[in-house]
Structure formats: C-alpha cells, structure tokens
C-alpha cells in the first residue's frame, strides 16, 4: 500500500496548457460489458471491492505501459513542472532502499515504519539524495502525485483512466479471474509480476528478479497487450475513492463519486505481499490523497476512442 507524504504548504500551481489529444503508445479497447469487483472475497472490507457489479464501457484507449522516467523527463523539460514531492521537499521511501545522508532521514510513517520520509526524495532521486535514475529510463516514474499525473496527462494530450476503464483493461479479456493472467499467482512456477517475495518488510528474496521497480515491459503483457497491470507501481485513476461506491455505481461509464478526500489507486506495487497488502489482484483497490507521493506510486494514461494518433508531446 502507498503512504501519504505531508501536503505541501502552498497550493499546486496550475498545470501546463493542454496539448492536442493523442493516442500514441496506447492500445484501443472495444469497450463492452464486464463484471467489476472481487468475486473471491479476498479484499479488505475498507477497500470496498464488492459487490461485484456489471459495468458497460464505451471504447477507449489506454497506455500499453506505465509512464516512464524518460517520458516524464520530457514533460518536465518542456514545461518546467515541479512535482508535489519537490515542492514539499521530501517523499516516502521504502526503508531498505534509502540512499540519503542521515540528516535527510526525517522519520517513519505511523503504523507503517517501513516507509521513511526522506528529504530530497523525488522522481529524479527516488531513493534520496544519493540516488538518481541513471540506467532507469524505462522504469516507471515514481514519487508522482495525482496532481503530477494529471498535469502530465494534460500535456501529453491524454487523461487518467477511470477506475472502471483501468480494471477492464487490466483484466485483459479474462472474466472473473483473480489476476490478469488467470487464478494462479505463478503458473508453471513462473512469476508474472513484480511483487514482494520473502518476509515483509525485512527480507525480499527477489525471486521475480527485482528488488524495486522493474522496466515497464517486464514479464508478459496481458490479453489486451498491457504490461505490468499487477505489481511494479501503483497507478492513479481519475476517480475519487469511496468504499461504498460499488453499491451505488451507475452501470454505464462510471466515473466515481462527485467528490472525496482521496483518489483511487490500482494495480499494487513491488512491495505487495499477501501478508501485508495482497492488492496485486485485478479487483484490488486502494487510495491516497491527490498530493501524496512515494517510491511506489506511478500512473498510465488513457483517452477517448474517437481520436487519431498524432501529438508531438511525447
């Protein structure tokens, strides 16, 4: 699960001007009807993964992968965008990967001591001042808030997916399954996603090949051609979060509650383990405040289906 960083003292500045809309790097999905929610009864009650309910979506486009460090760097270079983590001056880093002077270690999160608030941690320095993203251009960008993700999407001529679009896309055409590839976590003894193995939060055996983030085209894509819809990094959705929303959700193209305190997160991350998180299931939900950031928060973009490819933004 992600953890909130304290809110910046100043309000976020207006985002960049919207670019012409683009479907570059995206897969077109036909839409249609699907059963949304947890059919296995494995979710946390407070997450509101039930009742399973029928949703019907119009066709839409969605990114094949999470947004990478390289793509986010292009956005920052073009716009001068300053992330919420940079504005506040610190962000949440998992305790085993902190790379910062002792003076930059500002303390742990209440109830989640494995999360350390690190001065100077942000998307360019994801583990702290002694880290950088050299050699990681194709890893998902992290330490990005919902506000940052929305600003990027606007610049790229895209938008964030709705929660319903995200789950439909993540399922890869499989109905009623636990994961994007079926019901077994490791079919044939092979890992299909980047999550925690070992004893959380102190021992990660990295059987899946990764201790932290993995390149965005690791493992296999799902049936829709989307990569890493389970694990690696949490992905922001456009919706406000409510644990009771599924009981009142409209059937056609739901967009979430009209207001709220937190935005929806989907997909789980490299820190998910069944003893702690278990949110790499395709129906799993989480949430965080729009200005929160951490070393396992990222995003991918979506768009309407009546568009043609073409923006030069990326």
Curated annotation (Swiss-Prot):
Cofactor(s) the protein requires to work: Cu(2+)
Effect of residue 272 to S: Abolished formylglycine-generating enzyme activity
The keyword Metal-binding is assigned to this record: yes
Binding annotation for Ca(2+): 194-195, 208, 210
Biased composition range(s): Low complexity: 1-20
InterPro entries the record matches: CTDL_fold, Sulfatase_Mod_Factor_Kinase, SUMF_dom, SUMF_sf
Binding site for Cu(2+): 272, 277
Region (Disordered): 1-31
Keywords: Calcium, Copper, Metal-binding, Oxidoreductase
UniProt xrefs under PANTHER family: FORMYLGLYCINE-GENERATING ENZYME, SULFATASE MODIFYING FACTOR 1, 2
Family of this protein: Belongs to the sulfatase-modifying factor family.
Protein name per Swiss-Prot or TrEMBL: Formylglycine-generating enzyme
Origin species: Streptomyces coelicolor (strain ATCC BAA-471 / A3(2) / M145)
């Amino acid at each position: 699960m992600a953890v909130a960083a304290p809110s910046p003292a100043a309000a976020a500045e207006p985002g960049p001007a919207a670019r012409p809309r683009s479907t570059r790097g995206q897969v077109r999905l036909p839409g249609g009807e699907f059963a949304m929610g947890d059919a296995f009864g494995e979710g946390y009650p407070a997450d509101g993964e039930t009742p399973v309910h029928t949703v019907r979506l119009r066709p839409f486009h969605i990114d094949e992968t999470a947004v990478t460090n390289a793509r986010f760097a292009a956005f920052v270079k073009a716009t001068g965008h300053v992330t919420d983590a940079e504005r506040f001056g610190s962000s949440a880093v998992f305790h085993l990967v902190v790379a910062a002077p002792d003076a930059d270690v500002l303390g742990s999160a209440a109830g989640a001591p494995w999360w350390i608030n690190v001065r100077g941690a942000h998307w360019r320095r994801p583990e702290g001042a002694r880290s950088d993203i050299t050699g990681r251009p194709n890893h998902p960008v992290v330490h990005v808030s919902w506000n940052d993700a929305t600003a990027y999407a606007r610049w790229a001529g895209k938008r964030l997916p709705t929660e319903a679009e995200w789950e439909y896309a993540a399922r890869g055409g499989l109905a009623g399954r636990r994961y994007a590839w079926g019901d077994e976590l490791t079919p044939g003894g092979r890992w299909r996603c980047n999550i925690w193995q070992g004893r959380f939060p102190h021992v990660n055996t990295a059987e899946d090949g990764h201790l932290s983030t993995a390149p965005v085209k690791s493992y296999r894509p799902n049936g829709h051609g989307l990569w890493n819809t389970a694990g690696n990094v949490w992905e922001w959705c456009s919706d406000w979060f409510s644990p009771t929303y599924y009981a009142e959700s409209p059937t056609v193209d739901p967009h979430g509650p009209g207001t709220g305190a937190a935005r929806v997160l989907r997909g789980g991350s490299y820190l998910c383990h069944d003893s702690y998180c278990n949110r790499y299931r395709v129906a799993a939900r989480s949430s965080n405040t729009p200005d929160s950031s951490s070393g396992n928060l990222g995003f991918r973009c979506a768009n309407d289906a009546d568009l043609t490819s073409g923006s030069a933004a990326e």
